[in-house]
From Swiss-Prot:
Pfam families: FA_synthesis. The gene is plsX. Gene3D superfamilies: Isopropylmalate Dehydrogenase. It is an enzyme of class 2 (transferase). It comes from Idiomarina loihiensis (strain ATCC BAA-735 / DSM 15497 / L2-TR). It is found in: Cytoplasm. GO terms for molecular function: phosphate:acyl-[acyl carrier protein] acyltransferase activity. Keywords: Cytoplasm, Lipid biosynthesis, Lipid metabolism, Phospholipid biosynthesis, Phospholipid metabolism, Transferase. The lineage of its organism: Bacteria, Pseudomonadati, Pseudomonadota, Gammaproteobacteria, Alteromonadales. This is Phosphate acyltransferase. It catalyses: a fatty acyl-[ACP] + phosphate = an acyl phosphate + holo-[ACP]. Pathway: Lipid metabolism; phospholipid metabolism.
């Protein structure tokens, strides 16, 4: 396998390039054999690279990009009016073969539009999907897709999401024969609309997939399924609801702990003994949604990500590039489609 080179859109996100460069400092030490192409405005990035002693680092190549896609830019407008944006230049490095993966914390709609235009989908893939990993009660991860790339989907698209998600679970988490479910309003076969029921029939008929039926939202974190499939509208609402609930619980715990010194004492006592469990639940560890179904690896970081969270997105990019995930998805989709002939 050729040496990995990861393109970093340093200008995307709400917190500016300083967060990206701070994350990059950690990444170059964690992955000494990986190269990083940092794309953005040279005058802004050079002082930051100097600050973190990365200016002359052999693993880093700085590429100037004159334009920046803002968080409020319309996707179509960004595609037409900003061909020299840091996001587009980073994506183009994949097409040119200079890099094997790209990470951006920029405008989600713009990233999806520019990635789709620049990279194209894999042969046979109808639509790309946004996918993320969720912690589950078994100690592993469950992969949820789509998270918003496609507000509505037909049954064949949902079927393909199941195929792609299974490849991700198999090669990124080492799960043999990943269990696939469709997110639905009930577990009975009669529940859901025609699109979901038809997708269920397609998944059940495919001998190469381990489809286990419908799953409800309250079992997303149970580990019952390794891959949970839904359209982008449902997936986005489900994910944002989970994030909102987590924030609410953390805020409530913080208010309670601050109300009395004794609560803080016992919390510190428990925290030392449950460190691994708490650490596994930190949202920063799960930052980085994969835009799968494209010809190259594209990772979307939260726009408001901390340096630690952006580092997790870089880790995701390295893992997918190392496993050559797009190529594996391509072969699996081809095999599944040939089975249907």
């Amino acid at each position: 396998m050729p040496e990995l080179n990861i393109a970093i859109d340093a200008m995307g996100g709400d917190n500016g390039p300083s967060i990206v460069i701070e994350a990059l400092e950690k990444a170059v030490h964690r992955y000494p054999d990986v190269k990083f192409t940092v794309v953005g405005h040279e005058q802004q990035l050079t002082p930051l690279l100097d600050k973190f002693n990365l200016s002359s680092h052999p693993s880093i190549n700085l590429v100037h990009a004159e334009q920046v896609i803002e968080m409020d830019d319309k996707p179509g407008q960004s595609l037409r009016s900003k061909p020299e944006s840091s996001m587009r230049v980073a994506l183009q490095s994949l097409t040119d073969g200079n890099c094997q993966a790209m990470v951006s914390g920029g405008n989600t709609g713009a990233l999806m539009t520019n990635a789709y235009f620049t990279l194209k989908t894999l042969p046979g893939v109808l639509r790309p999907a946004l996918m993320t990993a969720l912690p589950n009660q078994t100690g592993g991860k469950s992969y949820l897709l789509d998270l918003g790339a496609n507000a509505s989907c037909d049954s064949e698209t949902l079927f393909q999401f199941g195929v792609m998600g299974a490849v991700a679970a198999e090669y990124l988490s080492g799960v043999p024969a990943p269990k696939i479910s469709l997110l639905n309003m009930g577990e009975e076969d009669i529940k859901g609309n025609d699109v979901v029921r038809n997708a269920a029939a397609r998944l059940a008929q495919c001998e190469q997939l381990n489809y286990i039926g419908f799953i409800e939202g309250n079992h997303l974190f149970s580990g019952r399924a390794d891959v949970v499939v839904c359209d982008g509208f449902v997936g986005n609402v489900a994910l944002k609801s989970c994030e909102g609930l987590a924030t609410f619980i953390i805020d409530q715990m913080r208010d309670t702990l601050n109300s009395h010194w004794l609560y803080r004492f016992f919390f510190r006592f428990l925290q030392k003994r449950t460190h691994k469990s708490w650490d596994r639940l930190k949202p920063d560890h799960y930052n980085g949604a994969s835009l799968i179904g494209l010809r190259h690896v594209v990772i979307k970081s939260h726009g408001s990500a901390s340096a630690g969270a952006f580092y997790s997105a870089i880790q995701q990019a390295v893992a997918e590039a190392h496993e050559q995930l797009p190529e594996r998805i391509k072969h699996r989709v081809e095999a599944v489609l040939s089975e249907q002939l």
